[in-house]
From Swiss-Prot:
Full protein name: Endoplasmic reticulum transmembrane helix translocase
Enzyme nomenclature, EC number: 7.4.2.-
Organism of origin: Schizosaccharomyces pombe (strain 972 / ATCC 24843)
UniProt keyword Ribosomal protein present: no
Annotated positions binding Mg(2+): 485, 487, 824
Catalytic residue list: 485
Amino acid sequence: MGSKALITSPDISSGQLYIKLPTFFHLYVWPFALFVYPYIGYVYQNKLYSEEVRYLTYIAVGTIHALFWLAGEWNTKVYCLMTCRKTDKVEQATHILVTPSKIGESSSVEPITKLVLPDSQTIQYSFSFQRKRFIYEPEKGCFANITFPMDEPSTIGTLKKSTGLTNIQSEIFLYRYGKNCFDIPIPTFGTLFKEHAVAPFFVFQIFCCVLWCLDDYWYFSLFSMFMIIALECSVVWQRQRTLTEFRTMSIKPYEIQVYRNKHWFPISTEDLLPNDVVSVLHNKEDSGLPCDLLLLSGSCVVNEAMLSGESTPLVKESIELRPEEAVIDVDELDKNAVLFGGTRVLQVTQSPFCKLKTPDNGVPAIVLRTGFETSQGSLVRTMVFSSEKVTANNRESLYFILFLLVFAIAASGYVWHVGSKTERSRYKLMLDCVMIITSVVPSELPMELSMAVNASLGALSKYYIYCTEPFRIPLSGHLDICCFDKTGTLTEEHMVVQGIAGVNRKDPYSLEKLSDASNDAILAIATAHTLVLLEQEGETPKVVGDPMEKATVENLGWSIEKKNFVSAPEGSVFYKGKVQIIRNFQFSSALKRQSSVSNVRVSGGSFKTFVSVKGAPEVIATMLREVPKDYEKIYKDYGRKGSRVLALGYKYFKNYIPENQVSDLSRESIESDLVFAGFLIFTSPLKEDARQTVQMLNNSSHRCMMITGDNPLTAVYVAEQVGIVEKPTLVLDIKHENEKILEWKSTDDTINLPMNPHKSLEASLYEKYDLCITGRALSQIINPDVIMSIFTHAWVYARVSPSQKEFMISTLKHNGYITLMCGDGTNDVGALKQAHVGVALLNASEEDMLEMQERARNQKLMGVYEKQIQLAKRFNLPTPPVPPALCHAFPPGPNNPHREKTQEGLNKVLEDLETKKASDVQLTEAEKAAERRANLANKMFDTLANASDDEAPKLKLGDASVAAPFTSKLAVVSSITNIVRQGRCTLVALVQMHKILALNCLITAYSLSVLHLDGIKFGDTQYTISGMLMSVCFYCVSRARPLETLSKERPQAGIFNTYIIGSVLGQFAIHIVTLIYITRVVYLYEDPLEKVDLEETFKPSLLNTAIYLLQLIQQVSTFAINYQGRPFREALSENKGMYYGLLGIAFVAIAGVTEFSPELNAKLQLVKMAYNFQIQLLATMVVDYAACWIIEELMKKYFRDNKPKEIVLRN
């Protein structure tokens, strides 16, 4: 059985079966137990070697044994090699090695579960990887991701006739799919700490501390070890808290009606299984749906905020009226019938044709997926199992460390060569060599990088931007292409109705009011929608649905009523009649149209069946009985002005069709032979920050493009408004309908140029014009080179389908460009997931977010206050006073003195405002702001007043969208610049850390080798003080905030390049020269030691003093010169913590040289220096700093790669 074919899943690249061996037979147990340790014992008892050799042998063997065990913890393949043996037979295997296909995810060894199935007594083999279950399929000889009944092709008719599960089926399904729950185990603190404690860098850091302890640096080593362990404990605690919060994301089980064995009865939602038929109902607890469901009958209004983050209610229609012979398509055609797990049901409407009556007046639905296989489960898995430790380019970092290792090996070789000629202890010599080699591995790098990314996450959350995959933040720092959807992204979500065109026979170009259209056109407008009336207990009924449709019906003056009735305003011919929508086909981005069937009765007349269709003009044109003369010119003319144009068609059926027969109508028969009713003209204003954001991205070396499903003329107009296109624009489209000939057209139709789909674009075309491509034209081009030529030079893509958006992003990715996609998280899911940086914009307001934050803050306060009350009761103390923020949550009284004061203050503000309004005095902006704050305070008053009656809220899904790794709760385009800003900041910090750590490591290696052999040592106090000051700088190095304006200059993306390596080596060379120079100067003032005793304890000397103070300045220059501030983030002087930390170190160094404070010098164990020597040492410090600065500036000027790629440039 080949390892590659063992698991068939796009998420897993390979797998291998293993048999776990008993503990004694593990490779890190039996060789040591049977041979190594008995031999060591024999040597020890017989004293065959010197004590020094035996001592070194014990340390070496202990280290090797530990490394044997740790190697298995670090690498799963090594673990399998040491603890298991391979097998090709699944019947024998106990474990399986799983290698994921995603870059950055680690391999995992998972146990294989064996279950005896009750129906056939066969054994089912399965394993779980990242909470995803894989089952062995004997006929295929491989493991496959668990499949659900709905994954197999099923007809609509089959699902409609579904009678639920039988007892035997439910028992089999329970074995196969398990319970419907999110089982996220929370490890204990000890378990998590053990996982962190065996991490390579942590082990390495502790190992280094132990080495320093062996070399008599106790204070410094113990202080470092304490800091490392404390930091790791804080990380473990944070991780444990995060896992606890993730666990609260699962929906609390509740009872639901299920149809099994042809009977309805209640069961817990945890016991639901695929193919169960359930009754969907709005429950009082407001719990989310327990799993993914397919609506069989009726309709629902749902809120998918927990899943997508979008709070706008959506209308879901069942598959009831779909043709029975049609095959179910939950990803496209039937997507609107899917109820996703975690979404809240706001309202259900039963169908009069439903044969399966529910006992609780709910609507029937069939279970599609359960547990972690649901859409909500997928999002939870992404959040739980996304890379927890953020790393840089691992390959580059490895090369960088290997490069530094060359210098360390040379230094340790020098120490061994010189030391072996003396009588020095081989133990100490080997210890020195190991310490030198370990000194070049920057053990602080993971911690520093993690701090930089966490700082960015925190900064983004202040803008209500949330990220589920933090490793993508550095990617946003070197973006090449930024793609934007139009509607709801660059333009506002709400549409303004301008009127209707094409209805005035004398002047078809004129724009008329909707109410001035013909009666048939008015009826078409009033019924061509999917709006419903949402009625919730205790709330005013409200209309929910597409914002554009709401705006249209409101403009017309009609109203939406219960049971899909629409009522006309007084004065209309339909005022006292009846209009009921009996069938809806929701708008589909693939089909580009929406249609409705209604039964209409004008007052006193008979019923008629009426069809209304609206959609893209070019689509509706194919359905019209007769296309008007200027049809194309009219809609293109309005499109050029930036309006959104929808064509409207209608027809009456010859015979009245009752509601119970409407399901017999096919969509094709409905959407044909239509009468043209006009063009609905909408305008969607640009978002306030759209133009400014696009301009900032253009000016900061990014290529901005628009990818939209709207028509090309409107898209080009909006692109011109925001600055995506600057030159005259040509649109590539098919020449005539139903033809494959492509043609370039100007937006005013004055230019027509042929296009060869087999030939790349000519330079003369894109140098003179900006280009727009339609989805129809793109589908005609097959040649990959031509496609890439278009993607390189086009700026606007219009009338593209969701799948085409995804194809475009993936093509750009595969050609080496770093991409960003910004969309609404609904139609753009595929493209958002494909992009390196996908950003879903949601529609919450800042006031909503502030109110939510205030509510959360007060709930935390409530928890703290309740604990205070419990403690007071336990110790018989008086009840503590209510905090001011919670005063409205408790009744007034002596224990709540703040409530009356707060109420009095609010009443006074409101009285003053009312007085001003009554006297018709114009309110100032400040007073308007005060009024808004007072209204918000009133809302908070009501919220807090009811807070004591509610349970403490738990963290739920809603911050993150299932569609994208980045989610902006606010629908502002400036979220993109905020993400780019933080990405650049993190990327700059990454490069900076590599440089600083590399220089520190090289200087340390030199100090431990050449300087150490010259008898130069540092005292414990010197190490501790400089180490503490360096810790402050390391902490602050990644805390610099980004600048508001994005610079045209791009940050250096890589690590292993001429600029970084050249700068590090150049600065290192300067430091070495100054160290050698000052050593020789010292020998002019004191004689060098004839014989250096390396084992001698530290004694202050002029050489030690000079080297220590010079190295302090070298550390200052390393941080200050390699610090990258403007134009990406605040300058060194603005990063106060680091600035003052470096000033502190410089002060210590200069004060030590000038002997400014004898007490400080005594504390630092420095000796007195001659005046001339002080001058020379100060001059050397200045030369060292200045020379390093010059090296850095020269390398930066001539070798830094900060030029944008060609695709970013307009020509």
